């Protein structure tokens, strides 16, 4: 009796795989700054407009823009920050975006580090989100996506090593 159930389970799984859409690509900025007085590394988090969960600025590809340029543009539009964006991604994470019609779309997000050096008073989505600077440990607690937590942790370790090397000179 278990054999027919196993076959049915396999068929159901195969059908799901056939109809699953490939993930849609997005680009994000892991915005950071180093406090001048304390030397503390801080991350910028903001709330999503739909669910209010803590996220980093991200968006869809834009015609004529490279992926890291899209990440920087989204950081400005969503949080009003400008800075120097790295051209190589730190990594990627996955999540399911719920569209306005309720459909869930799997997304794969490439993340680029952005060293913030300017905060704008006016920007496109001002007032639509809560924006906060937090420690790396707080950022890891607030974001939901495990892969994004790993990216933040790895970035913190990279920056800590960079600070230690600079102090050793």
Predicted regions and their residues:
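Acidic, metal-coordinating catalytic segment for phosphate/diphosphate chemistry
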Residues: 1-36
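Short, charged/polar surface micro-motifs in flexible loops or helix N-caps
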Residues: 34-38, 49-53, 62, 95, ...
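Short, acidic/hydrophobic/Gly-rich beta-strand patch recurrent on exposed beta strands
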Residues: 44-47
